[in-house]
Regions:
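A generic, residue-level signal for flexible/boundary positions that often mark functional hotspots
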Residues: 6, 28-31, 35, 62, ...
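Amphipathic, hydrophobic secondary-structure cores in small proteins
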Residues: 9, 15, 19-56, 75
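C-terminal structural segments of small proteins and small subunits
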Residues: 50-78
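Solvent-exposed alpha-helices and their adjacent loops that cap or buttress functional pockets
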Residues: 1-4
Length: 78
């Protein structure tokens, strides 16, 4: 079993928003990846973006700039 580490989890209302986030992050060299929404969190769709917790402000500004709507941003051990 892998060791859990603090992560920033960004959830979305729809799968389309999650996929759009993945595409934009790849195009703009933002680190992170799409993951299934962890059990500790409830979300509109089953996908979430996972990245380092110190990226919270950067990701919030990036999503606002790119027009990506998210449901929730939380830091959890993942």
């Amino acid at each position: 079993m892998r060791k859990k580490e603090p992560k920033l989890i960004i959830t979305f209302h729809t799968t389309a928003e999650a996929i759009a986030m993945e595409k934009l992050c790849k195009e703009n060299q933002k680190s992170g990846r799409i993951i299934p929404v962890p059990r500790e969190i409830s979300a509109g769709c089953g996908l979430a973006w996972c990245c380092e917790p110190d990226m919270e402000q950067e990701m919030a500004e990036f999503m606002k700039e790119k027009g990506v709507e998210h449901e929730e941003m939380v830091q959890i051990m993942y």
